[in-house]
């Protein structure tokens, strides 16, 4: 059984832990919001150059997402082309994912 001082210490620890978790959640949300904004900005610059070809639209979305996450860069794009193609193909052949990707692109282009 905990004495009063131990209970106070435990409560303080739990409060500090909760505050730390909430602060981290706010930081993650902020980073997420920044990533979405960067994704939309990059995609807005790419989409006008691909026309209405769904495969190219999906490919541009994949490339924008991977670049925002730092997975592909100007220096390694050739090395990552197989990964981009594999992800693009996966989305292209899944009707639900394809429709979602195209809908996102249309929304960004409006």
Language-model segments: residues:
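Amphipathic protein-protein interaction modules
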Residues: 51-93
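Short, Lys/Arg-rich amphipathic alpha-helical interaction segments
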Residues: 89-110
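Short amphipathic alpha-helical segments that mediate assembly, nucleic-acid/protein binding
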Residues: 14-18, 36-39, 59, 80-84, ...
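Low-complexity, intrinsically disordered export/secretion signals at extreme N-termini
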Residues: 1-52
């Amino acid at each position: 059984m905990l004495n009063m001082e131990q209970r106070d210490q435990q409560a303080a620890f739990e409060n500090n832990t909760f505050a730390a978790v909430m602060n981290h959640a706010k930081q993650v949300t902020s980073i997420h919001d920044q990533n979405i904004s960067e994704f939309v900005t990059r995609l807005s610059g790419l989409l006008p150059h691909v026309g209405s070809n769904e495969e190219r639209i999906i490919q541009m979305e994949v490339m924008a997402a991977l670049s925002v996450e730092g997975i592909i860069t100007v220096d390694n794009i050739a090395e990552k082309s197989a990964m981009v193609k594999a992800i693009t193909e996966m989305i292209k052949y899944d009707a639900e994912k394809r429709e979602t990707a195209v809908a996102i692109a249309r929304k960004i282009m409006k």
